[in-house]
A protein has these predicted regions:
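Low-complexity, glycine/alanine/valine/leucine- and proline-rich hydrophobic stretches
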Residues: 165-167, 188, 192-193
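Proline-centric
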Residues: 27, 173-185, 198-243, 254-260
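Conserved short secondary-structure elements within globular domains
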Residues: 1-6, 193-201
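Signature of N6-adenine DNA methyltransferases within the class I
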Residues: 1-98, 169-173, 180, 185, ...
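Short helix/loop capping segments that flank catalytic or ligand/cofactor-binding pockets
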Residues: 31-32, 118-121, 159-162, 185-186, ...
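Conserved hydrophobic/aromatic beta-strand scaffold that supports enzyme active sites
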Residues: 18-22, 109, 150, 175, ...
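Polyanion-binding catalytic cores of nucleic-acid enzymes and NTP/SAM-utilizing transferases
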Residues: 57-168, 172-177
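Non-catalytic DNA-recognition/assembly elements of restriction-modification systems
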Residues: 48-93, 106, 112-113, 222-270
C-alpha cells in the first residue's frame, strides 16, 4: 500500500465516506509506511502493521488518536476472547410468534431498541418460549443466566446494559457473559460503556454493527480490588438512572490511564 486519500464529497444517495487506495505489487514486510491525504488536503505518513486479527482493516488516525490508543494498549492485561457469547432468538416469523400483550404462558422478550446504556425499556413484545418453534435459539443457560450483559447489535457505538432477570432477547440484541481477570461483570460493563472504550471501538473498527471479534480485541487493564469495588458500586447507581454515576465512571477510568486534559477532551468529543 502506497497511499490512501479521503474525500469530503459523497456520492448521491450514499451516506458512507469514500476513499481511493493506491497499491503496488511488492513483497509484504512486517510493517508498511503509507501516506494519508485527508479531506482537508493535509498529508501525514502512517505505519501499518498487518496482523491476522486486523481483518485487513486500515485505521485512519491522527497522531492524538494513535497516542490514546497506544496508552490503552500498553495497559492491556486481558480481553473478552475467552468470555461466553450468545445471539438473541431468531424466531423465523416475528409476525406470527411475537404478541403485543401479555397473556398466560407468554413472557416478555426484549429487542436491541429496548437497550440503552445502563437501561432497559419495558418490553413491548411477548412470546411463548418453545425453542422448537424458533429458527435459531441459544442454550437456556445464556438467557437464564443469573447475570448477563446484553448489547445493541446494530449500532455504531457501544451500548450495553445488565440483566439479572433471566429475560429473553431477540437477535437485534446479543448476550455476553464476560470473564475478565480481576473484574466483576459490572466492572466490565463500566469499561464497555465508558467514553474511552467507545472511542477505541469507533476509531479502530468504525463498523455499523457491534461484532464479537471486534469486542474481543478491546484491551482491558489490570485493576486492584478497590477499583473493582468502586466501579461496580458506580454501575449499581448508573443502573438506577443516576447520570452523575456515569460521569464518575469515566473519571475513574481516565485517572486509571492517567490521560491529560486534552486527551480526555478528544475522547469525550467523539
Amino acid at each position: 500500500m502506497e497511499s490512501l486519500k479521503c474525500y469530503r464529497e459523497r456520492f448521491k444517495g450514499v451516506f458512507t465516506d469514500f476513499i481511493s487506495l493506491k497499491v503496488s505489487k511488492k513483497p509484504v514486510f512486517d510493517s508498511q509506511n503509507y501516506l494519508v491525504y485527508g479531506a482537508n488536503n493535509e498529508v501525514s505518513k502512517k505505519e501499518f502493521v498487518p496482523r491476522e486479527d486486523d481483518f485487513c482493516a486500515i485505521p485512519i488516525l491522527n497522531d492524538r488518536d494513535e497516542a490514546i490508543i497506544s496508552i490503552a494498549e500498553r495497559m492491556r492485561h486481558d480481553d473478552l476472547s475467552h468470555s461466553r457469547w450468545a445471539l438473541g432468538i431468531i424466531t423465523g416469523n416475528n409476525a406470527k410468534v411475537l404478541k403485543d400483550r401479555p397473556k398466560k404462558d407468554l413472557e416478555p422478550i426484549f429487542t436491541g431498541k429496548d437497550i440503552g446504556k445502563y437501561s432497559l425499556k419495558p418490553a413491548s413484545r411477548y412470546i411463548k418460549f418453545n425453542r422448537a418453534d424458533f429458527q435459531q435459539c441459544a442454550k437456556d443457560e445464556f438467557y437464564r443466566a443469573k447475570e448477563k450483559l446484553v448489547y445493541k447489535f446494530v449500532s455504531s457505538r457501544l451500548c450495553f446494559t445488565y440483566d439479572d432477570t433471566q429475560s429473553l432477547f431477540l437477535n437485534s440484541a446479543n448476550i455476553l457473559i464476560p470473564e475478565v481477570d480481576g473484574m466483576s461483570i459490572k466492572t466490565v460493563l463500566a469499561f464497555l460503556n465508558s467514553s474511552l472504550f467507545n472511542f477505541l471501538y469507533v476509531k479502530r473498527f468504525g463498523d455499523l454493527k457491534i461484532l464479537r471479534g471486534n469486542l474481543s480485541a478491546l484491551p482491558f487493564p489490570k485493576i486492584d480490588a478497590e477499583t473493582d469495588r468502586k466501579l461496580s458500586a458506580l454501575v449499581d447507581e448508573a443502573l438506577k438512572g443516576n447520570g452523575n454515576a456515569v460521569a464518575a465512571i469515566d473519571k475513574v477510568i481516565f485517572e486509571l490511564y492517567q490521560f491529560d486534559t486534552e486527551e480526555i477532551r478528544i475522547i469525550q468529543e467523539l
